Swiss-Prot record:
Keyword match ATP-binding: yes
Domain of life: Bacteria
Binding-site residues, ATP: 65-72
GO biological process terms on file: tetrahydrofolate interconversion
GO MF assignments: ATP binding; formate-tetrahydrofolate ligase activity
Any Pfam family hit: FTHFS
Associated pathway: One-carbon metabolism; tetrahydrofolate interconversion
EC number annotated for this UniProt entry: 6.3.4.3
CDD domains per UniProt: FTHFS (cd00477)
Protein name: Formate--tetrahydrofolate ligase 1
Protein family: Belongs to the formate--tetrahydrofolate ligase family.
SUPFAM superfamilies, alphabetized: P-loop containing nucleoside triphosphate hydrolases (SSF52540)
Length: 556
């Protein structure tokens, strides 16, 4: 089997102007970034707003292994299969962060024969969205420090600045830094730090904004610091929301590319699901819904993170809720949840599949709480045995959830046809009746307890001293009606990454809340979730190179 990049480079790409015609987009509706990439114009997005939205398919997964379970690959393969069936389909996915690409992943544009192209561009600088977000974020940091230096009219307490700088790389050495050292002309010395760009609130804002006006309003609503008397300081107090919007005026436009099979794909935005809401942009998803009969989108990590946030945070900003949810499961992950060591996952173990099924079962039950039909997709791997597959199918039948084996990595669209047919059948036979898990009127405490007990299966929530104080403060500031975005490990339902399967007798501890008032949610911090990742001992970057003719090498 060829590597992902070898497969990608063997494909004769079609001009993006030809690809977009499939969904009614003309050359005048796009802004080209070379022959194979483009951005969609504001005019076209506005023109299709009155269109009736098509069907929306949300792809999510069980709690993953460190290698991931193939949601992006499955999403791409499913969209290609639907198109092959004659259904006018678009993809709406996140764009990769350079940090994980250079770190552990090596690439994030699907895999095998289910990829979005040109994968080298998508994985590296793409159309510059990440750089624009990084620049806007760091411009705000510079403007805050300049305000301190120029007299500090707002009375900002330098010890209580919560806005950090960002970089689109994994760089643990920058997690905590001191700025303003050297002399009085270098600014006011203070503690600062760097997050990875995809953890920036500006990334979340870009992905939830519905147009430029909404983007500007959300940027103005960002809380950057507190005054000496503990009052919040907003971007609007600094009067720089216009400048930040200007930096982002092109980045807010969704990017158009293609799959190996020529399916049009909107790739836009990429917040992490363990520290943010983990979904691509509202603009991309909404526009795809109005251009195509079927839109396939994904939410990051397991359904306890990305899908929960998609359904509670993103859906209220979309023209409609999902018509079906596809939960991706792999036998290797189920065996890991069933107690098998990583080194033994290749060996057949039907009993471990039975034990690990508890994880998948809870995800199915959780998604059914939202009153949306669920389908299970088994992402096939070479090491899977017929006995293990039969075991998993039988277990799915016991809980009456449709299940299909999909081999899109190895076989592309053909490998996803059975899944696509089942998804279409389920949508035709069972209408979704979307129900949100909580109300905006619930308190922050009630929202957290609801997520922990109803989605994670936890027993109770423990609020640390700082979190308890913040619950009172945030209510006084009027932030208590915002949804909650939990920052939690992706590997477990709990806040302990080693507690696999479907644990029940556990508490979740909220140590702190972080206001993301521009994005429109409050983050609850659990465990030791990092907002600036580090690199592994052997980074993926060590396998990367470029040929003399400029061809990328080693992007997995």
């Amino acid at each position: 089997m060829k590597s992902d990049i070898e497969i990608a480079q063997s494909v004769a790409l079609q001009p993006i102007t030809d690809i977009v015609k499939k969904v009614g987009i003309d050359g005048d509706d796009i802004e080209l970034y070379g022959k194979y990439k483009a951005k969609l114009s504001f005019e076209k997005m506005k023109a299709v707003e009155a269109n009736e939205p098509g069907k929306l398919l949300l792809v999510t997964a069980i709690n993953p292994t460190p290698a991931g379970e193939g949601k992006s690959t499955m999403s791409i393969g499913l969209a290609d299969a639907l198109n092959q069936m004659g259904k006018k389909t678009m993809l709406a996915l996140r764009e990769p962060s350079l940090g994980p690409v250079m770190g552990i992943k090596g690439g994030a544009a699907g895999g095998g024969y289910a990829q979005v192209l040109p994968m080298e561009d998508i994985n590296l600088h793409f159309t510059g969205d990440m750089h624009a977000i990084t620049t806007a974020n760091n411009a705000l940091s510079a403007l805050i420090d300049n305000h301190l230096q120029q007299g500090n009219d707002l009375g900002i307490d330098p010890r209580r600045i919560i806005w950090k700088r960002v970089l689109d790389l994994n760089d643990r050495a920058l997690r905590q830094v001191i700025v303003g050292l050297g002399s009085p002309v270098n600014g006011v010395p203070r503690e600062d730090g760097f997050d990875i760009t995809v953890a920036s609130e500006i990334m979340a804002i870009l992905c939830l904004a519905t147009d430029l006006k909404d983007l500007k309003k959300r940027l103005a609503d960002i809380v950057v610091a507190y005054t000496y008397d503990r009052k919040p300081v907003y971007v609007r107090d600094l009067k720089v929301e216009g400048a930040l919007t200007l930096i982002l005026k092109d980045a807010i436009k969704p990017n158009l590319v293609q799959t190996i099979y020529g399916t049009p794909a909107l790739i836009h935005g990429g917040p992490f699901a363990n520290i943010a809401h983990g979904c691509n942009s509202v603009l991309a998803t909404s526009t795809a819904l109005r251009l195509a009969d079927y839109t396939v989108t994904e939410a990051g990590f397991g359904a306890d993170l990305g899908a929960e946030k998609f359904l509670n945070i993103k859906v209220p900003n979309l023209p409609k809720a999902p018509d079906a949810i596809v939960i991706v499961a792999t036998l290797r992950a189920l065996k890991m949840h069933g107690g098998v060591a990583k080194s033994d996952l290749a060996a057949e173990n039907c009993e471990a599949v039975r034990l690990g099924f508890a994880n998948l079962k809870r995800h199915v039950e959780n998604m059914r709480q939202f009153k949306v039909p669920v389908v299970v997709a088994i992402n096939e791997f070479v090491a899977d045995t017929e006995a293990e597959i039969a075991t998993l199918k039988a277990l799915c039948e016991e809980i009456k959830v449709p299940v299909e084996l999909a081999s899109v990595w190895a076989n592309g669209a053909e490998g996803g046809l059975a899944l696509a047919k089942t998804v279409v059948r389920v949508i035709d036979q069972e209408a979704a009746d979307y129900k949100r898990l909580y109300s905006d009127e619930d308190t922050l405490e009630e929202k957290v307890i609801n997520i922990v007990t109803q989605i994670y299966g936890g027993k109770a929530v423990q609020f640390g001293p700082k979190a308890k104080t913040q619950l009172k403060q945030f209510t006084e500031f009027g932030w208590d009606k915002l949804p909650v975005c939990m920052a939690k490990t992706q590997y477990s339902f709990s806040d302990n990454p080693s507690l696999l399967g479907a644990p029940t007798d556990f508490d979740i501890t909220i140590r702190e809340f972080v206001p993301k008032t521009g994005a429109g949610f409050i983050v609850g911090l659990t465990g030791d979730v990092m907002t600036m990742p580090g690199l592994p001992k052997v980074p993926a970057a060590m396998a990367m190179d470029v040929a003399e003719n400029g061809t990328a090498l080693g992007l997995f």
